Amino acid sequence: MDILWHVIYFLATSKFLTLFIAFLALPVVIGLSVWKGRLAKYYAVIPVLAFLNLFFGTDVAAYAMHSFGEKGSATITGSYDTSTVYNNHNVVGYHVLLKTADGKVVETSFEDDDFNIYPPKNSVVYPGIGDHFTVYYLRWFPKDFVIVDNDDSPWATGLRCGRLRNDVQEANAKYEFDRGNAGYRSDYIALINKLLSEKCVDDNDEVDAFRHDIENIEAGQP
């Protein structure tokens, strides 16, 4: 089964190569369709799938890897330049050390146009050098993997807490602008409580300051 997912992963992360091969094979497909007319609709699916792979291939690969892969851990050890440009962006590659479930360490890499993040999303944030994160990989092809950004790994936790802090800052700005707005007050309090419950604040003084803010808001004090 790993071989099938390996092929799917390769095709999904080689979108333009897949499309190029499909169009090269188009004359063959047309010829087969003429020769075997009753099977034409099946042959026609090939270029259609290659086109759809441009938009949904990485999502399918991410879900497949997470569903059928094994859980491991990884860290980024360095980056490198590539000669690829994607959407006016110079693609950057990253060197990775991946530790499998049985403790084996594998050297691998990925590029930031692979979109190998689970759950899939339109805009992705990748770990930096030295970050530790969770991956799902194929047992027989451990160099095929996706990065998990919504679990409790150190990197994913930092990412989640960073987003929460941004939300708290935005809610605070709204509340400070219009303190009489009940919606702004409740949103600000809810986000502070979420920030604290997610254990995103380590400093006891900062925790006390947030709780003091909540008490003041609920008491109607400035």
PLM regions: where:
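Hydrophobic core segments of alpha-helical transmembrane domains in multi-pass membrane proteins
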Residues: 43-47
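Membrane-interface helix-boundary motifs at transmembrane edges
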Residues: 33-42
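Oxidizing extracytosolic/periplasmic lumen-facing domains
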Residues: 2-28, 48-222
